[in-house]
Amino acid sequence: MIYKTYKANTYNIYTIKTDKFKTCHMEIVFRNNIDKNDITLRSVLTEMIVENTKKYNTRRKMMIELENLYNAYFYGVTNRVGSSVITSFCFDFIDPSLVKENALDFIKFPLEAVLNPNVKNNEFDLITLEYVKERVKKDIESIIEDPKNYSISKLLEKMCPDTESSININGYTKDLDKITPETLYNFYINMIKHDYIDVYIIGNLDMDKISNIIKNNFKVNILKNHNITYNINNKIIKKHKKLYESFSTSQENICIGLNITNETKFEKNYVANIYNMILEEYIHDVNVQILLERYAHFEIIGISILQLQFPKENK
């Protein structure tokens, strides 16, 4: 594998050249500090960009073009890391050399999708927006169908209210009705201008050529006038809190959470990760599961350390 980094005005292009795979993977990554007030906008915008574009202004046209690119796959993912939010637009495509195609045809697709969404007169397409909002609403509401994730989200809301830890990365249904084609476009422009952006690509490609294609077709001027922090200052809980919630489900869940404070940088980066591995091995041990099911009538479905609080390093 050959690793290279290319400077492109206000963003970087990170490449890994390898012939181990017959497909290539590309990501356009947006990073910023998470904000509860606009997390729903970000969730909707991510879905809008991968739904259609100005050039391919319907889902059908979008899918036909992806099929023409040998069944390429374009999708968006938003995650929270500490107190930051990361939105990635991902593109999986076949190694162009295997089908004797110009790499430009593949690389331009995700770049154009991000820079030229389905916008007219500074407004996103209303029909697409209403469809996407309904889909996002279902995604938000469907968490109750997953007892494990639902209980964890409720645990964080109870433990860490009014902090980044408790923010639902999918957004909030009460905010969906406030989103209009115009407000979504304004948020899009703000994200393009103020999010930190990087491009990642891996595959058997001429990376010098690919980096030039990206530079020529992805021209953004990012105003980096703020720092992105991953630290979350969760308040110390002096008394333990309990939350009971009952609803119809075939599986009951008990979540126990606690804030780990005064970690050193070494403990956070290494000890916690190793301890996570030990816990994961424990819950997947067949003998442990048999004993729990036979004598305790329950099973452990997950134990992990969620690094939600990042205090300053203790010297």
State each model region's role.
Residues M1-L69, Y172, Y185-V286:
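His/Glu-rich zincin catalytic helix
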Residues Y14-I16, K22-R42, R59-E112, N149-K174, ...:
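M16 family metallopeptidases and their MPP-like homologs
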Residues M48-E51, L69, E112-P117, R135, ...:
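Structured segments of extracytoplasmic/periplasmic soluble domains
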Residues N52-K55, P96-K100, N116-L126:
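Short, polar/flexible loop-turn hinges at active-site or ligand-entry regions and domain interfaces
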Residues K61-I64, N116-E141, H226-K235:
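Acidic/histidine-enriched alpha-helical segments
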Residues K108-K120, N217-K224:
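A common structural junction motif
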Residues E134-Y150, D285, Q289:
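Short acidic/His-enriched helical or mixed secondary-structure segments at domain edges of catalytic enzymes
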Residues D177-F187:
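Active-site glycine-rich loop that binds ribose-phosphate moieties when present
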